Amino acid sequence: LDGKIIASNKITCFNTRGTNYLGRTFAKNIDIPAGQVQALWIGINLPETARGKYNGNVSISANGVPAKSIKMEIEISGKTVADHGIDEGKHLSRLAWLNSNVGINNKITRGYIPVSREDKVIKILGRSTEIGDNGLPEKIMSYFTSSNQSISKQGGDIIDKPFQFIIEKENGEIVHLLPGKLQFTQQSPSFITWKVINTSDECDVVCNGRLEFDGFASFGLQIKAKKAISIKDIRLKVTMDKDKATYMMGLNKEGGLRPKDWQWKWDTTKNQDALWTGAVNGGLQIKWKAENYVLPLVNIYYDFGCLHLPPSWGNEGKGGVNVYEKGKSVIINAYSGTREMKKGEQLNYDFELLETPDRKRVV
């Protein structure tokens, strides 16, 4: 219209591209079963100066069929809507929030302190984590007092033993992984990252870790087979101090006192992939995931965006988690069961941690 245009980068199909919850751009294809109908949700960020009729074409393409061009015309009155109509749900303007970058930055929230490191020990507010040679936590401590109202100089152990990532072959033999050099790759006031390559005759395991100022940590364990391997089990074993495992919530267990024994299997009909067990002044939340993770929808919308079974941990329904007492410790054993790995095949055994309590500076 009179030489004016609405640029294509102002037009978004929310189904096919956008910004994810980590602030990263993505694009994806849509799979539609034969005979089914799929609505495409499209938003246009109109310039405030736009008015009149605008004409254009939308091209829709699919595998195996020619692209279809659809003519589109919109008429703009020129009147502006307050806050883009976000205050009224009927306008559906809030769909734009799906691509928001609000709150995505590396700034430290007020009340926390910068992340610091002394050799292999990473310190955050009220907690410390020592990284083992293999890249996994070797020691996690809480310095919060029993009332959780102050921080003491004397810390208490949250875990009794280092995290163990175990690859057991069909014959019962454990794959001996030799850690390479532990490299701290990035450090800022809000986070620290590190990397280790663990090697063996059968496979390599690359460990990437990240710990943030509030106690959130993420771990990526990528296994690459050097030759064909028959596997009995691949598991992550976390040994917690019994005094720091008083309560439990998650994996189909409502919040309350931790049972002496709890067994759980992967089931994507339920939004369950994480466990918290702890006490008032120390604990761990663990979430198991893989490369196909997408944040599920909740409540009545869950069936429209359910949990994806991790190919690694889930292993076609063979995987699960057992929680049980052993002496003065509580064992969290996340197993994945039998499988065959071909030469060159890769598996991603990822998980997240939250070292609790997660709270701001106290007196």
Label every PLM stretch briefly:
Residues 362:
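Conserved small/polar residues in nucleotide/adenosyl-binding loops
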Residues 6, 67-68, 229-232:
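Short acidic/proline- and small/hydrophobic-mixed sequence motifs that coincide with surface turns
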Residues 3, 64-66, 201-203:
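Residue-level signal for glycine
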Residues 38-48, 352-354:
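Short, hydrophobic beta-strand segments
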Residues 68-77:
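C-terminal edge beta-strand
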Residues 1-23:
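A surface/secretory-pathway sequence property marking extracellular, secreted
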Residues 52-63:
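A short beta-strand micro-motif common to beta-rich folds, especially ectodomain repeats
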